[in-house]
A protein has these predicted regions:
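Sec-dependent bacterial lipoprotein signal peptides
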Residues: 1-20
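Extracytoplasmic metal-acquisition and chelation regions
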Residues: 9, 19-318
Length: 318
């Protein structure tokens, strides 16, 4: 934490230099309210809720150059933008602890909304092969005011959570710059979420196998899927143990799935090894998108990417 505070201080000192030539900062119209998002999903939700009213706002996403959220290093410009936000929407996990430091060091006066403070967060078990429908007790979800280090950060990958988040964000935006259209747009967007969710009913064998990290626990919970993964959450581990490799290979051998999964930025070498060790053939390696490192310019929205993810699961869960 000391190191992080030193970094924050250094960034603060650098701000005077950074004021010149800042991209998003120079585009902030001081006459408009500003909403700042740290992730792609939040940013897309805000745009859909605002609709045509987006022209009345400065809508900014930091970390829009494709950097993974778990390794993102905030810039001096990020710090200044946060200080100017009327609404700040962020994930709230340990990867964004710097956000808390930024709000404190910049005397943040806006309204902050952390996703993990407005859902039932999932605790990351420190294991590698696990059936994903083991739910924690409500006591384990008491987290407000405490570190989120032990919780899965990828709450946006639950369509059920997305509905709650959008409703909250709509109300929050209305508090800052009232408009009757936010609620209407939000309801229309939630209808689309419900429609998407209703298209996918997985019956029979509901095992999914990830020869990679596993940021999709929230999605698995939505559809009551069993999951087996090489690493829990977005673990920093890079080498799967022999026991993990053996377990994944055994599950592949037993289930004979049409495919096993890796993340959008994942290396498929482990997946190839798992398939080879299983002795099975004609098993596809399928990528799914966690939306945690999407660069500016992405033409697909949250719902389109979630539909692609669910279609990928459907290939295996027939």
């Amino acid at each position: 934490m000391k190191f992080k505070k030193i970094v924050i201080l250094a960034l603060s000192i650098a701000m005077l230099i950074a004021m010149t030539g800042c991209g998003d900062l120079n585009r902030i119209d001081e006459s408009k309210p500003t909403v700042v998002c740290t992730g792609f999903a939040q940013y897309d939700w805000v745009l859909n809720i605002l609709g045509d009213e987006a022209e009345r706002w400065n809508v900014i996403r930091i970390n829009d150059k494709g950097a993974d959220m778990h390794s993102y290093q905030p810039s001096a410009e990020d710090m200044i933008i946060i200080s100017k936000a009327d609404v700040l929407i962020y994930t709230g996990g340990m990867s964004e602890e710097w956000i808390i430091d930024a709000m404190e060091s910049q005397d943040f006066q806006g309204k902050a909304y952390a996703l993990l403070d407005h859902c039932e967060p999932i605790c990351i078990e420190d294991d590698h092969g696990h059936e994903g429908h083991d739910h924690e007790s409500s006591d384990e979800h008491e987290h407000h005011g405490h570190s989120h280090d032990e919780y899965d950060e990828h709450a946006w990958l639950s369509l059920k959570n997305a509905k709650m988040f959008c409703e909250d964000i709509s109300k929050l935006l209305d508090e800052i710059y009232p408009s009757s259209s936010y609620d209407k747009n939000c309801k229309n967007y939630i209808d689309k979420i419900d429609e998407l969710s209703s298209q996918f009913v997985f019956e029979g064998n509901n095992n999914i196998i990830f020869a990679d990290r596993f940021p999709f626990r929230y999605l698995a919970e939505d559809f009551d899927l069993n999951w087996y993964a090489a690493f829990p959450g977005c673990s920093a581990e890079t080498e799967a143990s022999f026991d993990t490799l053996k377990e994944l290979s055994n599950v592949v051998k037993e289930d004979r799935p049409a495919g096993i999964f890796v993340t959008e930025t994942g290396d498929d070498s482990l997946a190839k090894t798992v398939i080879a060790n299983s002795g099975e053939q004609n098993i596809e390696i399928i990528k799914v998108n966690s939306m945690q490192s999407i660069p500016k310019g992405e033409v697909r929205g949250y719902l389109e990417i979630m539909e692609e993810n669910l279609n990928a699961l459907k290939k295996v869960l027939k």
